[in-house]
Swiss-Prot record:
The gene is KIN17. Residues 191-224 have a biased composition (Acidic residues). One of its GO terms (molecular function) is zinc ion binding. This is KIN17-like protein. Residues 376-427 are annotated as: C-terminal subdomain B. Residues 147-183, 283-312 form a coiled coil. Its main location: nucleus. A zinc finger (C2H2-type) spans 28-50. GO terms for biological process: DNA damage response; DNA replication. It comes from Oryza sativa subsp. japonica.
Length: 430
């Protein structure tokens, strides 16, 4: 029986049927050929081209199935990202839109046998937020592109703050060097003032003068004798003209020292020793304070370095109590409800078991908040320098939005953190 003419009703009907979606069981994924009925599909399976494709499949079946699975996943997520980027929608609706394309990758050629299994895979891998409801499975696409932009902005902000902190440290070190140089200059000046004017330089100068005058010593002796004679004559004349002062004959006698004078000398020496001891004590105290301040500065620098290394943009960890703040979950009654983090997926998505309903949800950390316990309760430090440590809540400052905690167990046991932000601590589930 020959083919129908091009413009006959039968030919037009055949072309219309070929454009639409046919039965999936008559589609060959390896050959990418759609058959219209069972007889046509049987004839295709007996063809040489199909037999060659089946030989290729038999050589590496796992690789072929994995390739089709990747194509199916990429195409499905592309459709979900473009058409339903920020909406919560039924999985069957998205799947019907996906298979509307005649050339789509069929699910029976992938490693997922059913749509339910595929939806569970999306939730398990963190591609979508998955909810099982009486009306079926609902999915919400997790927009990783906007998250990457936020992370990049936070990273740039953190780099700027680190650069500013480095500049402040450099200025502080420069000021310390200037103060040290000034203190060294003052100590050198004090040592120069304490030097005696009748020191070795004066002695050496007198020796030089004495050595220079040795050559003229013989010639000056005769002049000195004549000058002494004249001076003696003048002194005798003056004694006769002007009466001298009264001389006490007892002044020339040696004085007798009694015990009181010796005690005064001893007490003076003791006072000098006490003053020296006080001066040395003050110097020792100043040196100790300088060492203590240097040690404090080193500890502060180490604390800042630890803060920079342990400060991350993700904070979820298993075993903590969090509060769900997602508006999309408000319809189900999960908004502002507390749950326990059971598992963390890709660092940013948490598997939360609600405390009241015991339902398990997968929620991004941006839609979660930390929970602060009562005074005396146990918390976990989820971010910052002491990330991963358990601590005891001591007090809460509601004006500054920070808390005072004491680290328990571990390397920093007993250390008190006076002001740690609410976002860096979270209640531990008992």
């Amino acid at each position: 029986m020959g083919k129908h003419e091009f413009l006959t009703p039968k030919a037009i009907a055949n072309r219309i049927k070929a454009k639409g979606l046919q039965k999936l069981r008559w589609y060959c994924q390896m050959c990418q050929k759609q058959c219209r009925d069972e007889n046509g599909f049987k004839c295709h399976c007996m063809s040489e081209s199909h037999q060659r494709q089946m030989q290729v499949f038999g050589q590496a079946p796992d690789r072929v199935v994995e390739g089709f699975s990747e194509e199916f996943l990429d195409a499905f997520l592309t459709l979900l990202r473009r058409a339903h980027r920020h909406s919560r929608i039924a999985a069957t609706v998205v799947y019907n839109e996906f298979i509307a394309d005649r050339h789509h990758v069929h699910m029976n050629s992938t490693r997922w046998a059913t749509l339910t299994e595929f939806v569970k895979f999306l939730g398990r891998e963190g591609h979508c937020k998955v909810e099982d409801t009486p009306k079926g499975w609902f999915i919400t696409y997790i927009d990783r592109d906007s998250e990457q932009a936020v992370k990049a902005r936070l990273k740039r902000k953190r780099i700027k703050s680190d650069l500013a902190e480095d500049e402040r440290q450099e200025r502080m070190i420069a000021r310390q060097i200037e103060r040290a140089q000034q203190s060294m200059g003052k100590t050198n000046g004090e040592l120069g003032d304490d030097a005696s004017p009748d020191g070795s330089e004066g002695e050496s100068g007198s020796e030089d003068e004495y050595s220079d005058s040795e050559n003229d010593h013989e010639g000056q002796e005769e002049d000195a004798k004549e000058a002494n004679k004249a001076a003696g004559k003048i002194a005798i004349a003056l004694q006769r003209a002007v009466p001298g002062p009264k001389v006490n004959p007892l002044d020339d006698k040696p004085k007798v020292k009694f015990g009181f004078e010796e005690e005064d000398e001893v007490s003076a020496r003791d006072k000098e020793k006490e003053e020296l001891a006080k001066k040395k004590g003050k110097d020792a105290i100043n040196a100790a304070e300088a060492r203590r301040s240097a040690l404090d500065e080193l500890m502060k620098e180490e604390e800042k370095a630890k803060e920079r290394s342990n400060r991350k943009d993700y904070w979820l960890c298993p075993g903590i109590v969090v509060k769900v703040m997602s508006k999309s979950l408000a319809e189900k009654g999960y908004c502002k409800q507390k749950g326990v983090v059971k598992r963390v997926i890709d660092k940013y998505v948490g598997e939360i078991e609600m405390l009241e309903s015991k339902h398990v949800l997968r929620v991004d950390q941006d839609e979660l908040e930390t929970v602060i316990p009562q005074i005396g309760g146990l918390v976990r430090i989820v971010n910052g320098a002491y990330r991963g440590s358990n601590a005891r809540l001591l007090s809460v400052d509601t004006e500054r939005f920070c808390a005072k905690v004491q680290v328990e167990k571990g390397l920093y046991d007993g250390k008190v953190l006076k002001a740690i932000e609410y976002e860096d601590i979270c209640k531990i589930f008992h």
